[in-house]
Amino acid sequence: MNGKCERCGADVTKKNLRQWMLRITKYADRLLNDLDKLDWPEKVKKMQTDWIGKSYGAEVDFPVEGKDEKITVYTTRPDTLFGVTFMVIAPEHPLIDKYADKITNMDAIKAYRTECQKKTEFERTQLVKDKTGVKIEGLMGINPMNGKKIPIFIADYVMMGYGTGAIMAVPAHDQRDYDFAKAFGIDIIQVIKGGDISKEAYTGDGEMINSEFLNGFTNKKDSIARMVEEIKKMGVGEAGVQFKMKDWAFNRQRYWGEPIPLVHCPSCGVVAVPYEELPLELPDVKNFEPGEDGESPLAKIDSYVNCKCPKCGGDAKRETDTMPQWAGSSWYFLRYIDPNNDKAFADRKKICLLYTSPSPRD
């Protein structure tokens, strides 16, 4: 809460750690399409559809002035490109560290980053909150459609783990961008006719204006298609698809959890523990508190960590992170359908029947 641990009151900060991920995004289309095969309530299927969050749009490259560099953004509204008057990147964006020696207000950038590390993702992305951010002095973006220079900001509401970690801002037609532009005195250029942008952003449909070859278009779908055609011809972008669903971070820095059966070898890389050596069991220890370095408690147990590579026989180290609680809760209950089996965890046929038969006892 407010950057403090709710239990002990200590400062809470975020650290970047190497993660093991389950690539569930590979199955995004299948998960989405097969919802039609399920006899579920429509409101539940709607929740699943929104969670998967498939969207169609475009990836657009914004050059960085004077640098052999570009910032790529994903947008569902490429038709509003002529209305882009600034960009926002996540505080964690690698562009900042890459050009730290060119940025003249790095102290302010670092201070803002520190504050962001104290916030949860929910706190950072709330719509109803004061708009905060820092302009990156020393770097400017260029709108690829009109060649105009546009400022680049960092702000907490842009997350590195979502999209490309950067957004193009069209304040005339997005309320959050509008509020940000008002707070920082940034130009607001209307490209869709309607509303009163002196009071608020216009988020409805209408005739395209101030957009050169799109002027006069009234159909949003046609406007988007025409813009995608143009950015592709210019070599600054192409049509794209994105999902809200993210890959599953499948590791935790704690003692109590299923060990991840992988070995890190300096010669062979990451090697799986042989099947015949499974299950890999946790060592019996008295102190299982995590260290201040963020490493798993298992990392401090030399007798567990140090091992031989299953592939080359050389010195190696075990993976010390453990699986999340979902790993155990997703399968332990299957033992109940075959509790007396002393040859396997559960008979595969019975497991199949559990999912395919009206009654597993049949």
List each language-model region with its residue ranges.
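Acidic, glycine-rich two-metal-ion catalytic cores of nucleic acid-processing enzymes
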Residues: 289-330
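Residue-level detector of beta-strand face positions
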Residues: 59-63, 138-142, 262, 306-308
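Conserved small/polar residues in nucleotide/adenosyl-binding loops
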Residues: 355-362
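Active-site-adjacent "gating/activation" loops or surface patches in catalytic cores
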Residues: 144-154, 321-354
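Amphipathic alpha-helical
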Residues: 25, 30-53, 95-132, 290-298
